[in-house]
Amino acid sequence: MSSVIERFLRYVAIDTQSNEESQTTPSTGKQLNLARLLEQELKELGLQDARIQEGYVYGTLPANSTKAIPAIGFIAHMDTSPDFSGTNVKAQLVENYDGQDILLNPEHNLVLSPADFPELLDYIGKTLITTDGTTLLGADDKAGIAEIMTAIAYLTAHPEIEHGTICVAFTPDEEIGRGADQFDVAGFGADFAYTVDGGPIGELEYENFNAAKAIVKVKGRNVHPGNAKNKMINSILLANEYIVKLPPQETPATTEGYEGFYHLNDIRGDVEETTLYYIIRDFAEDSFAKRKETMLNLAEECNKKYGSGHFHVEITDQYKNMKEKIQPVMHIVDKAQKAMETVGVKPLIKPIRGGTDGSRLSFMGLPTPNLFTGGHNYHGRYEFIPTFAMEKSVEVILKIIELYAEEHSN
């Protein structure tokens, strides 16, 4: 078993699920169990400054060259999604995959099928790592952690490979949008970085959604239903009117690529008051602004119909498209693309239909595009990762480091 796979299997066995309701950093103490292990392993690899700071793990592999090679960072996150259990993960190896259904769990008759996930057919003959159907796998982002750690281990075992300063960080709470909150950019020390938090092999991303959340509060008036005529105002029904007036063709289930959306992801309410929880996503700044304006204008329209004060919308920006911060330093994307091509991986440059620590970090002065881990179907029981993709990720990391060293040797 290759070292990246061995590391990955050890890391996924540690429960690191984050918790959006918590106000601590990290949001869950169990993330520190992995943090302490990674700190210890970095020190064993010779990164003597390895440390845990505010729940973040940092370490630096000093340059072994006197040339002016830029300091490169590699970042992955320790937490797994709150959307599905990460407790007692039992990873399963499926060797020489034959293209048929994979029985994840005989007891519950849970099957990973190419009928549902046709991308499985791309990996016939390969070894896959799956769940046992009762938890997520945690390739998001423990695969990234394992790949970075394996690359660092390779460099320390091969001092003849010339490199500049390599900075490593593992963050908590990325899955709940707080992964960059306490990130020490200055202390990290990199000139630029890469998150290793992407999906299938070849993914290379430097654009992401502009993101906001919207809370729509709808006020009603409750009276006894037996005496309610011309008196009751049912906030649930008013809320439904707001919902259906937003474009039904602009939801996550009906959009792809560079298309934006409105996503209603929670409703809580009764006759007296109903609250709608939306997220708003778009790549273009003008389209993003129009979406926010649409939600505000719709509330005004509903208030004109039902009376002032029944509808109130509060919109909070969450993160921005990092493209504007990456474009001035596109060499970091070009190097990653060349690294992939050199090791036999076809680059798949695509926008991130989501967020990433790299977006926030880019606006904090650390340009940070995103590299693939190799995983599929994150945040659920059908998550899987081909082992060869993890091995290729390690090769890409090492090749990026090598290309920068070569460039500054001339």
From Swiss-Prot:
Location of this chain's protein in the cell: Cytoplasm
Main location class: cytoplasm
Keywords on record: Aminopeptidase, Cytoplasm, Hydrolase, Metal-binding, Metalloprotease, Protease, Zinc
Catalyzed chemical reaction(s): Release of the N-terminal residue from a tripeptide
Molecular-function GO term, any one: zinc ion binding
Pfam family, any one: M20_dimer
HAMAP family listed in its UniProt record: Aminopeptidase_M20 (MF_00550)
Function in brief: Cleaves the N-terminal amino acid of tripeptides.
Name assigned to this protein: Peptidase T
Organism: Desulfitobacterium hafniense (strain Y51)
